[in-house]
Amino acid sequence: MLLIVFYTYLGYGILLYIIIRLKRLFKGNPLKAVLPSDEELPTMTLMICAYNEEDVVAEKMANTLALDYPHDKFRIMWVTDGSNDCTNELLQAYPEVDIVFSPERRGKTAALKHGLRELKTRYVAFTDANTMINRDALREIARLFMDPTVGCVSGEKRVAARKAGEMAAEGEGLYWRYESTLKKWDSELYSAMGAAGELYAIDPTLVHEVPDEALLDDFMMSMYIVQAGRRIAYTPDAYALEYGSANIFEESKRKRRIAAGGLQSIWWLRSMLNPLHQPLVAFQYISHRVLRWSVTPVALIILLIVNTLLVYFKVGTFYIVMLVLQLLFYLMSLAGWWLDRRGHKNKLLYTAYYFVFMNINVFRGMAYLRTHGKSGAWEKARRS
């Protein structure tokens, strides 16, 4: 159990780093990227799925219209899923925008599928209404699609806090910095294991039917492309910036959704667990995703119980040390929770708390899936 926990959170990253270093030693470092010229760029749609986003329409459109991409090759599509605020009315002020409206709220996956049916360009990039992307993002994405092995491009998610000391945002940001490093190395080894919905793009000719009840539409859509034999290329040079969750309660909504969606995807993508089909993909997928979403949270509990029994039966000093370290870590987590509730800040204690918080939400995701597994609609986490 200890080895499973270590491998999931540290060991895979260490192993991946060693493999990448060896690969660079024999094949050299990746060449410096050169962005394609206007003539080389393919047509692309930026699709934004929205539910009641009237507060961010103006900011999002200002960001979108400032992107560096030829206007004759670029389309903007907003898919509004059951919005009952002023989102549609505000969008009508922009003649550049194609508005695809569904009066019924069926969830983001159904909205994406609705938008894809209206698509008229070679590629499509997806982004959220509340995220801002860098000026060269779409050119960078187009550059990576010039590789015929690439069927999906994942940008980088960056999390910002509106003011210093917002611990929920800082915890989320720390997690995504680690996650982005793993994605970069995964991509360099072969393929990233999934794309983040804040910014990713696909070749629509490779789209696989994603169930409407999918909670992780971005992950499912991108991994179906890997399943079909293409790669997900990851680039930090195309990034989406969003503010972190307003507080730990709001962040819990996101973690619960990710956990529930992760369990859904393990079942729907179970053929990818077969090492005889795609050996390298199976290794990356199990190591980076499956263990974290299913096995390891349970292993943490079993590890503590078994370790306690071994100490009780006086098996050896090593197990006493391991139990003390575990209890100390959980006490640090408890202290981090206590301080956070009172508005105090301690990064070390909060990091321990955030780790435990993530794993608790895996079990909450399991419970959610049992009671709400047939709906793809989800309550949005309020941002800071």
What are the language-model segments listed below?
Residues 145-178, 213-217, 222-288, 354, ...:
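Catalytic donor/gating beta->alpha subdomain of glycosyltransferases that bind UDP-sugars
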Residues 45, 63, 77-88, 104, ...:
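A conserved acidic beta->alpha catalytic loop
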Residues 1-36:
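N-terminal membrane-anchoring/stem segments of glycan-assembly enzymes
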Residues 18, 22-26, 38, 242, ...:
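Membrane-embedded multi-pass helical conduit in multi-pass membrane proteins
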Residues 42-45, 75, 220:
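Cell-envelope/extracellular polymer assembly enzymes that use nucleotide-activated donors
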